[in-house]
Amino acid sequence: VLDYSSLYPSSMISENLSHDTYVMEEKYDNLPGYEYKDITHDVYEWINPLIKSKGKRKVGQKTCRFVQFPDGRKGIIPQILQKLLKARKSTRKKIIYSTVKYSEEGEEKEFSGMYEEKNGLAIIKTVEGEIVDFPLENLISKKDTYSEFQKEVLDGLQLAYKITANSLYGQIGARTSQIYLKDIAASTTATGRNLLHLAKDKTLERFDGAEIVYGDSVMPDTPLLLKNKVN
């Protein structure tokens, strides 16, 4: 199974999709020193506006242009998403934090963070980002930093960050939302769809005999299920 991490939020970040980066007036187009990203999405209309159950039909395509700032700065929405995804990532790490005690030159020391063992060494990346390593024989004790209750709280918090990040796309695509802008929502799904096709093409190119049996572009998960053919 191949799965993009936070596909729609990541799409909005990578293409800088935001209300303040969407070029809607000609005077903001082709400015010197700026680059632009064009995204083409499908346009649909109701088959029968009075009977919504009949569904929609594709009537064309529209190309939207988004500015890419020369200093690498992101638009408002991508900045918010970056903060949410970063917070989620750091929160998820805390769930598996360990607290270790070890001896060094007769002195007992204690650190908490991401723990691993490699080549006879105990290695821990502390909360502050410092890398500490010591011989495994100097290890006195190791325990989970957080209790089971605290882990459940942290898990709920990381899930809240994830849902909030995903819901920003939903709000932009909802007519009742104050931040509704259909072209941004459509450009997001178009980017996500392109990434799924890219993953499919690269997989088939890399793994001889692989077959795509399912692809899901519904949030929050976007897996590609693969089957390897047996000759």
Segments predicted by a language model, with ranges:
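Conserved acidic
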Residues: 1-231
